[in-house]
């Protein structure tokens, strides 16, 4: 039987924790999060749990496991997103049920702006092996604890990077005043 395993600290990407996200394969929408671990993070407990799930499903002889079984441990370098580090591991964990979500004081997080792509967290997950349209090992998301803030991943540039300052027509730059300056 699968047990909850605590992840090391990770950076949050693609959080679908307040409402289920879109299913990649057109299947049922699920809650989930992509966990971006730092290079060198101790993933031994997660690896052991994934192996346990595989042994439970397919037996101890790994040569008899499905040849093209999906591996839950991915290289962040496979994705071309800001904040993804080639050679570091990422794992996606999903759930049919909304995960519990707390802050460092173990208080529920209900404000969606408090938990975002780019913040830091840890989670409890359960490994399971599956055989349906495909075969593999995955992690079920149980609960999440936010550990800190980080630079948000937004997928967009700041407005100030898109535009140059503009001086109104007919006004020299030195004459340009702010609204507050008009009354002084």
Where are these regions (language model features)?
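Acidic, gly/ser/pro-rich intrinsically disordered tails
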Residues: 1-4, 151-184
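A short secondary-structure junction signal
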Residues: 46-48, 102-104, 132-137, 155-156
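Beta-strand/loop nucleic-acid-binding surfaces
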Residues: 92-110
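Solvent-exposed residues in well-ordered beta-strands and their adjoining turns
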Residues: 36-40, 128, 147
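Exposed beta-sheet edge/beta-hairpin loop segments within beta-rich domains
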Residues: 105-120, 128-138
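OB-fold/S1-family single-stranded nucleic acid-binding modules
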Residues: 131-151
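OB-fold ssDNA-binding interfaces and closely related basic DNA-contact patches used
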Residues: 1-90
């Amino acid at each position: 039987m699968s047990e909850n395993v605590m992840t090391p600290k990770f950076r949050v990407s693609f959080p679908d924790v307040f409402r289920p996200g879109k299913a990649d394969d057109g299947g049922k929408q699920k809650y989930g999060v992509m966990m971006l671990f730092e290079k060198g993070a101790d993933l031994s407990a997660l690896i052991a749990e994934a192996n346990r799930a595989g042994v439970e499903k397919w037996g101890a002889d790994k040569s008899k496991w499905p040849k093209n079984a999906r591996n839950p441990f991915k290289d962040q370098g496979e994705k071309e997103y800001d904040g993804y580090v080639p050679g570091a591991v990422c794992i996606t964990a999903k759930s049919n049920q909304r995960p519990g979500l707390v802050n460092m004081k173990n208080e529920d997080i209900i404000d969606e702006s408090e938990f975002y792509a780019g913040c830091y967290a840890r989670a409890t997950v359960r490994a399971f092996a599956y055989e349906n349209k495909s075969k593999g090992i995955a992690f079920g998301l149980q609960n999440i604890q936010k550990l800190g803030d980080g630079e948000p991943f937004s997928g967009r540039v700041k407005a100030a990077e898109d535009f140059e300052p503009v001086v109104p027509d007919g006004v020299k730059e030195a004459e340009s005043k702010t609204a507050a300056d008009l009354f002084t």
